[in-house]
From Swiss-Prot:
EC number(s) per entry: 4.3.1.18
Annotated organism of origin: Carboxydothermus hydrogenoformans (strain ATCC BAA-161 / DSM 6008 / Z-2901)
The reaction(s) this protein catalyses: D-serine = pyruvate + NH4(+)
Annotated GO MF terms: D-serine ammonia-lyase activity; hydro-lyase activity; pyridoxal phosphate binding
Entry annotated with the keyword Secreted: no
Protein name from the UniProt record: Probable D-serine dehydratase
Length: 422
């Protein structure tokens, strides 16, 4: 462990196999979530589909889902870049194309906003579960929601998903943003009437202050990325949908055809919820790996030290400064760290420079636009020992909303780094 910690402290790229992982059945028996919870979340999203279709006509019948794309040319580019071999097929889960919010956070963030809205409406006798929820778009419901506020702390993408959906329903919205949040993300929110509160400190401080402010206000609901069960379950629904997508492609996951999934990790809610869903469905035939920046490996440190959320990367001399803004988190979620400890297969870390190289290669090889955080998932398939019939899925967490001029800068930066390699 001392070698591992030394490497982490020196900002080295590390690959860690989780020695505490239990079999899926053992782990799931100890976790305070069940398949029924995932199914309930899925049903709630289906109830809201008519409303989402009305508010966001660009969605497919009100279901916010992303394509699963095989990326054979990118597979070759990754092998060429790192001089290794990826055994099996490589797919990209394109949450960078998710409608409404443009990132993986559309799954958990939007789900929790909808659940809160439904709870308020049911408690006030304004709807029943059997109603056509498209009527919630009517002005009288917006007027009702305007008496309530939704708040969240975010480095960017979670704030976007919650801000966009809550504002569309009529809620007042506060988004507490850390110093690393990108200006263009703040602009999207302000353009929708969201109150953006900026901090000079990091993500943990933005969440702490947001939580404190919300607790002191009447009718304010704080979505707590560090501890939220609802966010976690919103993400877990992705596993049900991924299973359907694999079935449509004629892919059956089993012991002979294992599934490897690589998930960028900030505080841990999205990768944690998705891993829980995947392990619930595919059991020990799926292998889940998180990826973090070398400057912000909060989940890795939490699990390696077994201190879980009671650490900050600064405790280890790390600066928590990374271009992967969605992953710039100093302390992991308590809820997720304790689950990941017995559930996930491992974690690897990646340098910022690699993110830009992979971002540029993905654009050149497959014409797919992702943000740096999303590109982190692309190196994983090269690091694990897998067999020839493995299915690898790199989870692209965001990117479609990046303004073109900013994306162009990222792309050119990646190209300049690649010049030194090729």
């Amino acid at each position: 462990m001392s070698d591992l910690l030394t490497g982490i402290k020196n900002y080295q790229q590390m690959f860690w196999q989780n020695p505490n992982k239990l079999s899926a059945d053992e782990a799931l028996a100890r976790i305070n979530f069940s398949f029924d919870d995932i199914f309930e979340a899925q049903k709630r999203l289906q109830r809201f589909a008519p409303l989402i279709k009305k508010l966001f006509p660009e969605t497919e019948n009100g279901i916010i889902e992303s394509p699963l794309a095989e990326i054979p040319r990118m597979k070759q580019e990754i092998e060429k870049l790192y001089g290794g071999k990826i055994h099996g097929r490589l797919f990209l889960k394109c949450d960078n194309y998710l409608k409404v919010a443009g990132s993986i956070k559309a799954r958990g963030g939007i789900y929790e906003v909808l659940k809160h809205a439904e709870t308020l409406l049911l408690e006030n006798g304004l709807i029943t579960l059997e109603d056509d929820y498209s009527k919630i778009a009517e002005e009288r419901f917006k007027k009702f929601f305007s008496n309530y506020k939704v708040a969240v702390g975010s480095t960017g993408n979670l704030g976007l998903s919650i801000g966009i959906m809550a504002a569309a329903l009529g809620f007042k919205v506060d988004v507490h943003m850390s110093h690393d949040a990108k200006e263009w993300k703040k602009k999207i929110l302000r353009d929708r009437g969201v109150n953006v509160i900026e901090y000079r400190e990091d993500y943990s401080k933005a969440v702490e202050e947001g939580r404190k402010k919300a607790a002191a206000e009447k009718n304010t609901y704080f979505i707590d990325d560090e501890n939220s069960r609802d966010l976690f379950l919103g993400y877990s629904v992705a596993a049900l949908r991924l299973k359907d997508q694999l079935t449509e492609l004629g892919i059956e996951v089993n012991k002979e055809n294992p599934l490897f999934v690589y998930l960028p990790c900030g505080v841990g809610g999205a990768p944690g919820g998705i891993s829980f869903g995947l392990k619930t469905i595919f059991k020990d035939d799926v292998y889940c790996y998180f990826v973090e920046p070398t400057h912000s490996p909060c989940m890795l440190l939490g699990l390696v030290t077994q201190k879980f959320s009671a650490i900050h990367v600064r405790d280890f001399g790390l600066d928590n400064i990374t271009e992967a803004d969605g992953l710039a988190v100093g302390s992991p979620s308590k809820l997720v760290a304790e689950i990941a400890n017995i559930l996930i297969d491992g974690i690897y870390t990646i340098e910022d420079e690699e993110l830009f190289k992979l971002l540029a290669l993905l654009k050149d090889s497959e014409n797919i636009k992702v943000e740096p955080s999303a590109a982190a998932s692309l190196k994983g398939p090269l690091l694990v020992n897998s067999r020839a019939n493995a299915i690898h899925i790199s989870w692209a967490t965001g990117g479609i909303f990046i303004p073109e001029e900013i994306y162009r800068e990222m792309y050119m930066r990646g190209k300049s780094y690649l010049k030194d390699v090729y």
